[in-house]
Amino acid sequence: MADHFRNIYSSRASDYHRLIAPEDADGHLARTLRRLIPPGQRILDLGTGTGRLPLLLARDAKQMVGLDLHGDMLRENAAQRSLSIAHWSLVQGDMRALPFPTAWAQVVTAGWAIGHLRGWHPDDWQTQISRVLKEMRRIAAPGGVIVILETLTTGSLTPAPPTEGLAQYYAWLESEWGFTRETLSTDYQFANVDEAVERSEFFFGAEMAEKIRANGWARLPEWTGIWSKRA
């Protein structure tokens, strides 16, 4: 599974963006982020991917920079930026060692990114994720906001961590690092069932495709957790 996601992020970024474009059909994510993040802030987005958070936040930011490890994701991000009225900068790098000075940003975000380290480094995930969290804390100015978004399952009518490993990571964020969790419905709204399968199967797999068909889901249920804290 680790190689599955790495391969997508390194070579199928445009397909990935086609998948996520119809996410958050009811706008819960956008409204929650606007509540947590005041306008006029300098924002650093880690694991920025194809631009999911910059597309939501950059227009109201004083400055926004997105960082990602994968060049293909950054190229698709730049393509999406060219279609947007907002602007943000892009940097290739590792979120465990950030090329920014201390207290550089008022807001540091990481969307659907840090959790991969739980699977990619099963034997020392706490060490690896701690490196990211310490860097987020270093970059965030005093009184700033740190926001982490992760999956709470796709294809279920109730929210829950999709794996035991992620459940451990989420609980650890709260108990050891003092983050507070909010749970949001962020369903995908596709035109029809066939489109839902066509756009999502490469990422979520054949079992999910069959579940979509069996339930007639043009609207694919999804849940997202938002963990936040003050710097």
Predicted features by range, described:
Residues 1-39, 145-172:
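Conserved class I S-adenosyl-L-methionine
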Residues 50, 180-231:
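Conserved Class I S-adenosyl-L-methionine
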Residues 106-127:
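A short SAM/SAH-binding and catalytic strip from SAM-dependent methyltransferases
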